């Protein structure tokens, strides 16, 4: 293991060796190869980064907004130039196929593009006359030092929800990437620095509990953005809020897809396969449950099973591979346990992904469990793997009632050509992001990622205008200017 590279933290524009004696292996989930080791940094290192970020904020927040935007535009151009390299890094440490990784890089670039619109986004508003000789104006100011806690499943897209917008609006930032996928962040830091970002404005501290707690407790840090599981998200929200921080926590999901009798069969099957099994099901917008009307159920499920059985599984760097590995061996074992729990509770296993025939890596094949009911563990829990539950329903109303029983409410989709059904779905479903005749309704950067219920803790979501509000304070100035002496 002596030749395995140990990653360093990025503080004050320099790569700094961690003071910790604890390191974790970063593993290629498709092969088991150790790619590098990541430090489990100390609380003191996080606190040091906070001091540096606070000092950098004092200068960066005073930089003219158009100049800050130019740095973001430069960063965006460098990301485009290095798109293929970034995609390969994602596949190497995360496992998703190269096509999906390229798509993730593109979404990250789009988030940087949106953030580069800071001169417009920072604009306030005003009213010239609120009373005699009195006017009022509303100004935006950055909140200060911001902390971000990012997950493994989208190592580029999710951090790019966070730090580009926060920094473009004048804040400084400390990011804790996932310890499972840290390599990509090295490259992003390099490119952001090359684009002209001053030292100390963006800092990266790898770690686990101590670093998370530092972000939540350090008084210098004024706001925290989190994406991850529900239990951790609840902890982040409660702890950060108790320490008087502004917090947004995007958490778990159990997304339902409704298939009505008039759905286009081929198109629906293609979309459901991609939504359920793409990225190995490790995404908070994955299709986890299909509720299908009885009239189309037999034909739809036969086609769905056939398509699932024909999915190519393997290393995401190999040509033609659709489904890569889950992130770790423990995730693989956990997924298999869920499948077996579903069988034990009465679900019918019609496509079995427990055995893939691959000798290396942490793979689970496409899995379909039918005759699922809402009292089953596999319906209730977020499995975060390529496992799809199927429920037959009599009509749209029943499908909506089933979906609305879930504690999660991130996304939901419907496949139909009936305008009335679409309107009913839109009005009655409890979810923040809806798809009509598409499988993954993740919004573009200029719309909020708007989960409901246990899928989100906070008030202001990531992305869109919400993110501008999250990363800025508002200051309303009311002024009296008498025109006495200027009478005509």
UniProtKB/Swiss-Prot annotation:
Alphabetized UniProt keyword annotations? NAD, Oxidoreductase
Q: Which SUPFAM superfamilies match?
A: ALDH-like
> Where are the annotated coiled coils located?
none
Q: In which pathway does it act?
A: Polyol metabolism; myo-inositol degradation into acetyl-CoA; acetyl-CoA from myo-inositol: step 7/7
Q: Which GO terms describe its molecular function?
A: malonate-semialdehyde dehydrogenase (acetylating) activity; methylmalonate-semialdehyde dehydrogenase (acylating, NAD) activity
One Pfam family linked to the record: Aldedh
Please tell me which top-level EC class this enzyme sits in.
oxidoreductase
Q: Which InterPro entries match?
A: Ald_DH/histidinol_DH, Ald_DH_C, Ald_DH_CS_CYS, Ald_DH_N, Aldehyde_DH_dom, MeMal-semiAld_DH, MSDH_GmP_bac
The catalytic residues are: 284 (nucleophile)
Residues annotated as binding NAD(+) are 150, 152, 176, 179-180, 229, 251, 382
| Protein's GO biological process | inositol catabolic process; thymine catabolic process; valine catabolic process
**Reaction catalysed by this chain?**
3-oxopropanoate + NAD(+) + CoA + H2O = hydrogencarbonate + acetyl-CoA + NADH + H(+); 2-methyl-3-oxopropanoate + NAD(+) + CoA + H2O = propanoyl-CoA + hydrogencarbonate + NADH + H(+)
- Supply the EC number(s): 1.2.1.27
Subunit and interaction comment: Homotetramer.
Tell me its family: Belongs to the aldehyde dehydrogenase family. IolA subfamily.
| Role according to the record | Catalyzes the oxidation of malonate semialdehyde (MSA) and methylmalonate semialdehyde (MMSA) into acetyl-CoA and propanoyl-CoA, respectively. Is involved in a myo-inositol catabolic pathway. Bicarbonate, and not CO2, is the end-product of the enzymatic reaction.
| Database matches in NCBIfam families | MMSDH (TIGR01722)
Protein name (database record): Malonate-semialdehyde dehydrogenase
Q: Which organism is it from?
A: Listeria monocytogenes serovar 1/2a (strain ATCC BAA-679 / EGD-e)
What is this organism's lineage? Bacteria, Bacillati, Bacillota, Bacilli, Bacillales
